[in-house]
Amino acid sequence: MLYAVPVCATIASGAVVGIDTARAEAMPGVKAVYHRANFGKLFRTVPPSGFSGIVDEKRPPFDDDKVTYYGQYVAVVVALTFEQATAAANSVKVTYRTAPLNVGTHFSEAEAVETPKVDSHRGDPDAAFASAALKVDEVYATPTETHNPIELHASVADFDGQNFTLYETTQAVCNAQDVMAQMLGVPVENVRVISRFLGSGFGGKLWPWTHAMIAAQASRLQGRPVKLVVTRDSMFQSVGHRPRTQQRIRLGATVQGKLVAVMQDSLNHTSMLDDYAEGCSEATGYSYSTANLRATSAIVRRNVGAPTSMRGPGAVPGLFALESAMDELAVRLQIDPIELRLMNEPEKDEGLNLPFSSRHFVECLKVGAEKFGWSKRTAGVGSMTGVGEQAGLTLGWGVAGCSWIAERTEAQASVELLSNGTARVSSATQDIGTGTYTVLSKIVGEKIGLRSERIEVVLGDTKLPAGPISGGSWATASVIPAVLDAVEKATQM
């Protein structure tokens, strides 16, 4: 086993004009120092299809001399031990040519890469807003957020001369297999990705990052397994984040509080090379009833690493802005914010013109109000500062709605009934700490009458039947129907 430690850029905008590796190469245990000049060719992926071939930082590592964000990998040291690789990486001298830097936290539509995209539209929101009796027109911002699970991103790559076996911290082994095969330039059947257990990811481990390609290519060049663990400080720079958003929300309403217009115009930053859109209107179109709605989105470039999915991407920052605006409207109407939400509850998804498969928002509001004693609330800002030991600790009581899609995707699974009275269930999905192993053993056990300890669950390996990503809260809902179908077929044989 060899250990790889990247050399990270100390500028955020410019180019590498020289790399002095002489001292590092002479240090004990060092096998190689790789950079643009000697790393070989890696390839970009084709546009993804479904949940296959997705990668947010599309530029292969060391692809050119450009530096577009602080912490970008510009070289990597491979050595016999992690300590030797770290010491050598620290001794590599990189010379840069700097360029103008843009990390500004205020966005304007004039900076947008393209004309804002219309994500959803119905009616004539501009006219309805212009004639509305009451209006809210505010801008809301959410900050950059990083995932930082306790388990660091890491890769162990083993190339045997023809095939790659990649042990990855990934929430999507099948997608990782496809991406790695494309970028390494080998057939997909020559790549096996394994992720048996995962110390969470929060979306940051859904798609492969450059460290995975570096480990795999280094293994190919060295002919030995290579391990690369992303350092904690690099977790803030090179493995994605939820981007800062800036959203203008316009609500128009009658004097009674019925919404006549909803408009949401969102901006988020992306990297200098990639086009990540946060999608802040994910839930806007179906949150409240209105005949007139428009949601647009646009991206602006900044010298940062590529953003990525994080815990309810789009919906979380988008609903923060929408719900804040609903509270502003309640204040101007001088009505209870729960009452405002109840009177604007939609009977169906007005964007799709379809009934909801499930929706319990009204129930949540009413039960929550009863359980929390909402009737005791006073509306004035700062009027509920607490009494006794709680004095001064609160500003008031608030309410906000939230929503997430109940989506499912295709999945495959196998179930084997073994001669020793046990069973095995397999699928190339993952357990990111949410209990997929336990859930599947319980489901199969209930169906065939076995205790869960007599059921082996095998996950996280692309040699298994293709399973769903562990993201979007849909892995369990997607894989269980496949497992139940396999159980039925196995018991009928």
Give the location of each predicted region.
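Extended active-site and interfacial segments that coordinate phosphate-rich ligands
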Residues: 4, 90-103, 171, 178, ...
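Helix-loop-helix junctions that connect adjacent transmembrane helices in secondary transporters/permeases
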Residues: 107-184, 345-422, 442
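Flexible, low-hydrophobicity surface segments
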Residues: 1-116, 138, 211
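Glycine-rich loop/linker segments at domain edges
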Residues: 48-53, 57, 118-155, 161, ...
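Stable alpha-helical structural segments in soluble proteins, enriched in small hydrophobic residues
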Residues: 75-79, 85-89, 213-225, 317-321, ...
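Phosphate/diphosphate-binding loops
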Residues: 73, 80-81, 223-272, 484-493
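Short, surface-exposed loop/turn segments at secondary-structure boundaries that line and modulate
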Residues: 34-72, 175, 193-214, 233-248, ...
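Beta-strand segments within the central parallel beta-sheet cores of soluble alpha/beta enzyme folds
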Residues: 36, 190-196, 223-233, 260-265, ...
